[in-house]
Amino acid sequence: MPHQKQNFSQLRLNYNFNKQNILTQNNDKNLMSVNKKILNSIKQKPYFSKGDFVLYKNDCLKLLAQLPENSIDMIFADPPYFLSSGSFTCQNGRMVSVKKGDWDLSNGLSRDFEFHLEWTQACHRILKPNGTIWISGTYHSIYQCGVALQINKYHILNDIAWFKPNASPNLSCRFFTASHETIIWARKDKKGKHKFNYKLMKEGDWPEDFIKKPKLQMRSVWSIYPPKKEEKTFGKHPTQKPIDLLLRVVLASTDKGDIVLDPFTGSSTTGLACALNKRKFIGIDTEKKYLDLSIRRLNELIKKQKSKLKL
């Protein structure tokens, strides 16, 4: 019998709300039963916990240092781009400052690079031997991240060009319009055997990609629109990623039941992608308002999924 092409919408909405649902509210004393040992190693109480979706409010370096070695299957990181130092962009036809917050202020080339070295090193320790990390960034930061990965002995697997079809124009008219971000995918150890769900990436019924053709391997240029209006219902993070992007990342490199961590979780799009596909999620951020936004987004997701099951 020929292999049946998997439907993308089914992949996104594949939850059954039953007693085994990982989004079911757990007692604080029973956090993430499969990962109880991991969470018990963290001294502070979670900012929020619902089933296998857990958030912490703290500096990621402090939290990562408390996690057990070789305990995380996959990490997605969207670290500060350090753009908030006088730059401008175009928004709705107007020139606006790109200052995202004090957390995005540059401390100079050396200090910024030292930061990337520190957090990637901390992530390397907690990844499982065959674990992988994805890092998203623009040209302002991604090259420093790439060098930091190599210094910390990761093995780079791919660099993905996330092409944005509706990118903002360049106001100065002196440069090419920046219409993509780069995502680096790397393995913890050069000799490891990382997870890659090749068949799903090749044969899944994904939205049409830039230069993608049927029955060919998925390529490293992904055409995905920035977050849709409905993804910003409760507000947005200034570097919020679209759910379609994180769904692809999560489904490409993890299996059901795997533990995914986001050290700069923001509005927790990574966590929502995990919740939709039965992965366990740990998110870390320093900003209360973005953790609260994450909680509202998760609760809305649960509400929508319950409504769909009643139809």
What are these regions (language model features)?
Residues M1-V34, N40-L293:
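Core catalytic lobe of class I
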Residues S41-K50, I295-L311:
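Short, conserved SAM-binding/catalytic segment
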